[in-house]
Amino acid sequence: GKGSVSAFLRSMAEAAGLSCHVYNSPHLCRFNERIRLNGNFISDDELIDVLSEVEGVNGSDPITFFESTTVAAFLAFSRHPADLLILETGLGGIFDSTNIVPDTACTIITPIAFDHEQFLGSDIATIARQKAGIMRSGRPSIWARQQPEAYAQLQQQARQLCVYVQTEGPVSYTHLRAHET
């Protein structure tokens, strides 16, 4: 799933000598696991500082737990230089708080299944349309094997955005243009 993919990417980046920040959810044992700064989990002190800062700036405006955690992570990331940032979506899709980054290098879509149905939809095609919302125009997107109805939705969005798509198999990209069928 998403967590395994982000762990694998982080491992490859660090093995290549890159400094890397990672945002994951949910955590396994400690909340600090959600925010990794250059290979290390955020310290308790820094976590308290960024969460307090987010709470102070936000005031009494409505904000979800995931949104405040995401903002705290971005705040921590902004204070530590890194070569690479790996973001794992929470709900995964159009309305996910991690989806505010306008210019991603690449997106990865793991197998789409029934999850977060109250937010994403009650059928695979609807969920896939939501998850396709992380793709960016002209940027590569790597997809795990998908159910046919999910694949069709991903492909439709990829065409609209002229996304380079890599699915299972050797590394080569298919550039889906809006006029292709």
Model-inferred region functions:
Residues G90-S97, V101-Q160:
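Conserved catalytic-core segment of NTP-binding enzymes
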Residues S4-S19:
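A conserved segment at the C-terminal end of the G1
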Residues C20, S141, Y164-V165:
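Hydrophobic beta-strand scaffold residues
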Residues A15-P102, L120, P148-E149:
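ATP-dependent carboxylate-amine ligase catalytic core
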Residues T174-T181:
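Conserved small/polar residues in nucleotide/adenosyl-binding loops
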Residues L28-R30, F114-Q118, Y173:
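Short gly/pro/ser/thr-enriched loop/turn and capping motifs at secondary-structure boundaries
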Residues L9, A73, L154, T174:
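Aromatic/hydrophobic pocket-lining residues that form π-stacking "cages" and hydrophobic walls in ligand
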